[in-house]
Amino acid sequence: MKLKILWVGKTQEEWLRRGIDEYTGRIRRYTPLEIAEAREEKGAAAEAMRTRECERLEKLVPKNARLVLLDERGDQLTSPELAAFMGKCRDSAVPEMVFAIGGAYGFADSFRARADRVLALSRLTFTHQMVRVILLEQIYRAHTILNGEPYHHS
């Protein structure tokens, strides 16, 4: 199963880019992975920014992909539960899973309605830039769990 990670805007901080590079390399040992950035909208009201950014994200989602949004109001899973969810998708021949991280103001309701699942990484709020590294680490962790490797300690 191919993975695609979408986010809005460029990663600003070098330390975050290093983390992204580290986990991207680790994940690619298990599965094909593509990362795509949608242009960040600036200088508009929050709702207009959400709408325009989500229109850009929508164009990057393949029609046959399973779309998972990362949002603070989503379902919270443990790492083993995320691994099980990803394994179930893989085993049911889902060709591609897309994880999307919104911009600073989140997702438009129309894009949220398109999602197959909405997940929250925590009840805490993280910057949308930090979520990139956290999500990639959790995807890597899920692969190690699915492969019975010793990275995750229960």
Swiss-Prot record:
InterPro entries: Alpha/beta_knot_MTases, RlmH-like, tRNA_m1G_MTases_N. The keyword Chaperone does not apply. Keywords: Cytoplasm, Methyltransferase, rRNA processing, S-adenosyl-L-methionine, Transferase. S-adenosyl-L-methionine binds at residues 70, 102, 121-126. CDD domains: RlmH-like (cd18081). Coiled coil: none annotated. It catalyses: pseudouridine(1915) in 23S rRNA + S-adenosyl-L-methionine = N(3)-methylpseudouridine(1915) in 23S rRNA + S-adenosyl-L-homocysteine + H(+). GO terms for cellular component: cytoplasm. It is found in: Cytoplasm. Its EC number is 2.1.1.177. GO terms for molecular function: rRNA (pseudouridine-N3-)-methyltransferase activity. Gene3D superfamilies: 3.40.1280.10. Pfam families: SPOUT_MTase. Belongs to the RNA methyltransferase RlmH family. Homodimer. Specifically methylates the pseudouridine at position 1915 (m3Psi1915) in 23S rRNA. This is Ribosomal RNA large subunit methyltransferase H.
